[in-house]
A protein has these predicted regions:
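Carbohydrate-binding surface patches
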Residues: 65-106, 146-149
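Short conserved micro-motifs at the rims of enzyme active sites and ligand-binding pockets
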Residues: 96-98, 122-125
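C-terminal beta-strand-rich structural cap/linker in extracellular carbohydrate-active enzymes
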Residues: 129-150
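Solvent-exposed beta-hairpin/edge-strand motifs
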Residues: 102-122
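Active-site-proximal beta-strand/loop segments in catalytic clefts of secreted hydrolases
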Residues: 28-31, 86-90, 115
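Ser/Thr- and Asn-enriched, surface-exposed coil loops between beta-strands
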Residues: 59, 64-66, 78, 93, ...
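Glycan-recognition and catalytic regions of carbohydrate-active enzymes
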Residues: 4, 8-11, 15-82, 121
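Acidic/histidine-rich, metal-coordinating catalytic segments
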Residues: 1
């Protein structure tokens, strides 16, 4: 599925799993294709300017692991940004992510980058500027990968 959204979703998901469980090394060979490239870049260059997902995994839980896995991280350099990867694997249903951020830091806004079944191009998908008490709800279209930066 290197040139299909299913491949992009699977690769994004496995990279999140590897980070969550501290996999030290994994290899891949062959042509990456458009969606596999996007899966790597959603972690390594989500804004086209070299910005990266954090290097310290933080707790992220979902009540629907089958359809909407979630991964989260922060940066060790203390820059304060929280990163969240949310995937909607569902072929035909929009997902509603009820995001409740724990910890002692207050977040009031975030920017969303992602790709979907329509295009492997990672692009800015929107912003949320009304986060209240570290909680908000986000609609995620079918077959979509979001990288949310707080």
């Amino acid at each position: 599925g290197k040139d299909h959204i299913s491949g992009g979703i699977a690769q994004t998901d496995v990279l999140g799993i590897f980070g969550k469980y501290g996999v030290f090394l994994a290899t891949r060979w062959g042509d990456s294709g458009s969606y596999i490239t996007s899966a790597y870049n959603i972690y390594l260059n989500y804004d086209g300017k070299g910005s990266k997902y954090g290097d310290i995994c933080v707790k992220a839980e979902t009540s629907d692991i089958e359809n909407m896995p979630v991964y989260a991280s922060i940066h060790s350099d203390n820059e304060g940004r929280l990163h969240m990867i949310i995937i909607n694997r569902n072929w035909d249903k929009e997902g509603i992510a009820k995001i409740n951020i724990g910890g002692n830091r207050t977040y009031t806004s975030c920017t969303i980058y992602g790709f979907d079944y329509q295009s492997p191009e990672i692009r800015k998908m929107g912003e949320v500027n009304n986060i209240q008490n570290n909680y908000f709800e986000l609609k995620i279209p079918p077959l979509t990968v979001y990288h949310i930066v707080f």
